[in-house]
Amino acid sequence: MNNKSSITALMSSFGRAFHTENEEHPVFEDHLAKKLMTAEEYAAVQGYILDGVQFFEPELDPAKQEPTELLHRIVNVHIAPSPLCRAAYTEQALKAAALTGTKQYVILGAGMDTFAFREKEFLAKHRVFEVDHPLTQTDKRERITRTGWTVPGNLAFVPVDFTKDNLTECLITAGFDPSVKSFFSWLGVTYYLSAEAIDTMLTALSRLCADGSTIVFDYPDEDFFDAREKRVQNTIMMAKAGGEPMQSAFSYKELEKLLEKHGFLIYELLTPDDIQKDIIDKAGADMKAFEHVNYCLAVRKDKFGSFHADNL
């Protein structure tokens, strides 16, 4: 595997690709995900998952099931639910926001996201900014070149090393306009950040967001770290073993207070039950929403403290 691409990013791409190809009723379709991976990487991730069946599902006997059946189960139960459902929710919310004046889309921690290459009609009318670590972004651009894709004119790559770079300065230098209504996706990140780091990011987002701008992110609830569900425990253990331990979780009240501190109001919050009903069951997919993980859509309130839903 390319050492510049984390196993997390490759697993996410594999999950998108495998789900798209093998699920009769997919939650989220990404026909480009596989193209960003080499055949060797795809096979390596597949082997990694099959080798870990006993970790994911100790009661399963790999010798008694076909590899494709095992992969389908592990992907749909352990690998794909969070990345796929949050992507489906975010892109649906983005398109709704675009109908009411949103002009810019910022993907924080873009990784191997393919939105800018799947949604050409959106790119024709809106600017998209992919923010990620310089090494990760260099690797992705090499992959894009290898596939022969043309980078859309309205897509800007914004390399940011959060240990030393200023997000606001980097985005504005790349052409971001903080006076324009924007949409920020911040997916799969809050788990790994300290409360202080999350507070710092929200400070930056507050300065970047014009009134009525939107941020969408996923986060673990207050019971996450004490959860008894096996796949939640596995996720916590894998993160720790990979050197990126999960650190933060929030109750609704804690999250509401934190967002209000930075000028954001919660417009919509999806619990696992909501995700199951509104995303998975609606698609007809064979999947269960990840326990203790919520999705939050928050909107920047105006300078006078009032807020109107029609500003979304």
Residue map of PLM features:
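Rossmann-like AdoMet
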Residues: 1-106, 112-158
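S-adenosyl-L-methionine
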Residues: 145-178
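Glycine-rich phosphate-binding loop signature in dinucleotide/nucleotide-binding domains
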Residues: 97-101, 174-182, 209
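Short, conserved loop/helix-junction motifs that constitute active-site signature segments
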Residues: 120-125, 176-178, 207-210
